[in-house]
Amino acid sequence: RCGLRTNSGNDIRSARRSLNLLFSEWGNRGVHLWKVQLNEQQLTAGVATYTVPTNVNDVLEAYISSTAQAADGPATNDIALTKIDRSAYSALPNKLATGQPSQYYVNRQIDPTISLYVAPDASTYTYLKFYSINRIEDAGSFTNTADVAYRFLPCMCSGLAFYLSQKRAPDRIQVLKQLYEDELIRALNED
C-alpha cells in the first residue's frame, strides 16, 4: 500500500514497531469491544484501594456485589457505583471511613488501581466487579496473530501503511492517512 519492498530485517522490525504504535493509538481513540472484560476482586474490610491488572487501560463501569442465601437458593444483589475523577476523589473527606461504597476512582498509572469511597465493611458486599477495557497486545514475534477483531484487519493494514509512509514514503502520507481514517471509521461504526 505504501509502495515499498521489504529488503532487510530492519524493515520488518520497523513495521512491527509501527504496528505497536498503531495499537497504542487505537487505545487512545476509545473503546474496542473485543477488549472489554469482566473482572472480580474480593473486598477486604476497611481496604479502599485495590490493584487491577496492568493490561487494564480503564474501567468502564463497576459495582459491588453480595450473595445471600434465599429460600430458592443463592441470590445475588448488585449495586452500581458512580465513577469519579481524581479531583472529586481528592476532595472526599475521610477516605478510610467504612460502609457501603457508592463511588470509585481509577488511577490509570503503569500499575493501575481502583479506589472505592467509602471503604467497604465487607460484611454485606463481598465483591467488586468491574468491566475493564484492556490494552491491545503488542505485535510480539513475527509469527504472532494480531490481537485484533477481524473487522479491524483492513484498518490495521491501512494504518500500518500510513505509519510506514511517514518513515519511507512521505509523498504518500496524505492518501494513506485518508484511507486509514476511512477504514477506522467503518470499523468503529461496526463495533
Explain the meaning of each model-derived region.
Residues 1-191:
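Glycine-enriched, solvent-exposed interface loops adjoining structured elements
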